[in-house]
Amino acid sequence: TGIRRSGKSYLLGTLFRKYLLENGTKPENIFSYAFDLASDIRYRNPLELVKAVRERVRTDGEQYYLFVDEIQMSDEVPNPYNKDGKKITFYDALNDLRSMPNLDIYVTGSNSKMLSADILTQFRGRSDEIRVHPLSFAEYYSAVGGDKYEAFDNYAFYGGMPLVLSRPTDKAKMNYLTTLFSEV
């Protein structure tokens, strides 16, 4: 969990994926669904997500990994088997998938709609929360290098949002931050 644009999706979908692949995980054993992408919109439905993952995970002794990005965009759907009005949620889907012994599940999200406390309550004793924060000065400096005092001045002014580092000019950095803060 963490604030928007703090690097959660990058850490999971790029760095952790790379780590898994470099350590022998087959690419086809890593399933990624990004609920903010139109191509994955159908998997916002918890029943569709469970169906898709269960079709891909084999009982062949191999380890599988599920990455779900932007979980706060998931849908609640009517329960077709129970007419009490209760909906099927992503909690139900993840609890179902969690029962698969050779599947590790990783979920990112950044919306107050799904508070980390609620998630930890739903999955008490069966999950770990990793909080992702903007870069510390040490992390920032390891990326920019150079004069430490100048780097600190820039860090104090622009902050530690990771994508600020990729903006080439002061104006581009300010535009990025202005847009980011207006979205929050």
Predicted regions and their residues:
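Structural recognition of the conserved hydrophobic beta-strand(s) that form the central parallel beta-sheet
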Residues: 67, 104-110, 131, 140
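Conserved glycine(s) of the Walker
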Residues: 7
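Interdomain hinge/linker elements that couple catalytic modules in large macromolecular machines
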Residues: 134-184
